[in-house]
Amino acid sequence: LNSVRALAAQYKDKIRILTGFECEYFPDYMNWLADMRAENHLDYLILGNHFDHDDEYGMYFGNIRTAAQLRRYVDSAVKGLETGLFSYLAHPDLFMRDYGKPFDENGRAAAKELCQACKALDIPMEYNLHDRFLSPVTHRRSYPDAHFFEIVRQEGVRVLIGVDAHEPEEIRNPAQWDLASRELEPFGALFEDHLCL
């Protein structure tokens, strides 16, 4: 954090550098997370809802196959958003990895419920490009999911483009960003090109 803050001060007239990170909603750690955010003066946190309750024994939400598991994902995401700690919801369509082929009524209902929570709380959803970089390796692509994001558009939820940034190339690839921007044109004013803090 110190080096990032030093760079932010050094380049303050050229670029705005913020501090924050993606993290889970683990109920037992929310007080710790709130304290840590305040103590470190972080600008934002991103809700990346990957695991149910914890990452050691909890179910991975990218492996959802049943309606009951999907219900757990939605409940966890909504509870995380309701904490007020998070500035946006990362890859909200993560559950589509294994669940959504084809996108059934339970999947559509889950998407709608997530959208309604985000809209009520005024929290945008991320149109995450990470799987586009990963799919040449895994030979499968799960998100961003067009069916899911059509519901997001219909529900009037704000969206922004993001990547997991596991590799620097994910950030340095303007072609992927340009493609995503074109895909989000139907969102009109709901598409935001930056996180409003």
Predicted regions, residues:
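Extended substrate/RNA-proximal surfaces in nucleic-acid metabolism proteins
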Residues: L1-A120
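Charged catalytic cores and adjacent phosphate/nucleic-acid-binding surfaces used
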Residues: R97, P102-L197
